[in-house]
């Protein structure tokens, strides 16, 4: 039986740039890696509230950490006169428990939220928690993505759908979805819906077409030919 690989990890360094960019000495590498995991988990709690579709981390050698928050609601994160972003920065520093760390949060706007796999997955999960039909929730996400310009989209929900005793997986797929083609720009994300019948897993794949060498949308990565 064929094994499925994560489409994001499959393309990192080829047609996708890594979400984390920094260099470290061998002695401090482990602690910085743990800090990155804590940062990602910290903002996972605010994904739905602030519509955060992607988090990127950059570090320099002076212990300065820049966290880029890609969101469709930048005003919600910034708050009035930037008060909310300041509170988030303080809360993150307390969460990391490292006073020497200089954390700087930067907000970037997602122009097309309907093409972001993470936001689509969270939208489906929210509808499932609101007891909407899992079929209609997936179809709404598919229509939104295709209308926004996606070349293809695939969704899947897994769990006790509609409260039945036996868990199962159901999904839909429209358009092209070449998961084995590395130059295919595929965005993949998962989400979890906490319902009264238990947890329901949500997976979303969004295809934005092929990335050709020299294209401006090549995500700062390149392929080499032997």
From Swiss-Prot:
Keywords, alphabetical: Ribonucleoprotein, Ribosomal protein, RNA-binding, rRNA-binding
Sequence ranges assigned to domain KH type-2 in this UniProt record: 39-109
Gene Ontology biological-process entries: translation
PROSITE patterns documented for this protein: KH_TYPE_2
GO CC entries: cytosolic small ribosomal subunit
Disulfide bridge map: none
InterPro entries hit by this protein: KH_dom (IPR004087), KH_dom-like_a/b (IPR015946), KH_dom_type_2 (IPR004044), KH_sf_prok-type (IPR009019), Ribosomal_S3_C_sf (IPR036419), Ribosomal_uS3_bac-typ (IPR005704), Ribosomal_uS3_C (IPR001351)
UniProt keyword Cell membrane present: no
UniProt-listed SMART domains: KH
Database matches in Pfam families: KH_2 (PF07650), Ribosomal_S3_C (PF00189)
Gene Ontology molecular function, alphabetical: mRNA binding; rRNA binding; structural constituent of ribosome
Keyword RNA-binding (UniProt): yes
Subunit relationships: Part of the 30S ribosomal subunit. Forms a tight complex with proteins S10 and S14.
Family: Belongs to the universal ribosomal protein uS3 family.
The protein's role, per its UniProt record: Binds the lower part of the 30S subunit head. Binds mRNA in the 70S ribosome, positioning it for translation.
Designated name of the protein: Small ribosomal subunit protein uS3
Species in which this protein is naturally found: Mycoplasmopsis synoviae (strain 53) (Mycoplasma synoviae)
Annotated gene: rpsC
């Amino acid at each position: 039986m064929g094994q499925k690989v994560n489409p994001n990890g499959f393309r990192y360094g080829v047609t996708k740039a890594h979400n984390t960019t920094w260099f470290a000495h061998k002695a401090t590498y482990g602690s910085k890696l743990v800090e990155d995991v804590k940062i990602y988990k910290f903002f996972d709690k605010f994904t739905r509230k602030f519509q955060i579709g992607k988090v990127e981390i950059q570090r320099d050698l002076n212990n300065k950490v820049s966290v880029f928050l890609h969101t469709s609601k930048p005003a919600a994160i910034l708050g009035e006169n930037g008060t909310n972003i300041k509170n988030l920065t303080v809360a993150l520093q307390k969460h990391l428990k490292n006073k020497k760390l200089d954390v700087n949060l930067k907000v970037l706007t997602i122009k097309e939220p309907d093409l972001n796999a993470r936001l689509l997955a969270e939208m489906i999960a929210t509808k499932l928690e609101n007891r909407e039909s899992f079929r209609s929730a997936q179809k709404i996400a598919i229509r939104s993505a295709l209308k926004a310009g996606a070349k293809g989209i695939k969704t899947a929900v897994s769990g006790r759908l509609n409260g039945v005793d036996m868990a199962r997986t159901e999904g839909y797929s429209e358009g092209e979805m070449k998961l084995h083609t590395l130059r295919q720009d595929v965005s993949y994300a998962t989400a979890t819906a906490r319902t009264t019948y238990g947890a329901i897993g949500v997976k979303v794949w969004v295809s934005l077409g092929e990335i050709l060498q020299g294209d401006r949308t090549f995500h700062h990565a390149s392929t080499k030919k032997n």
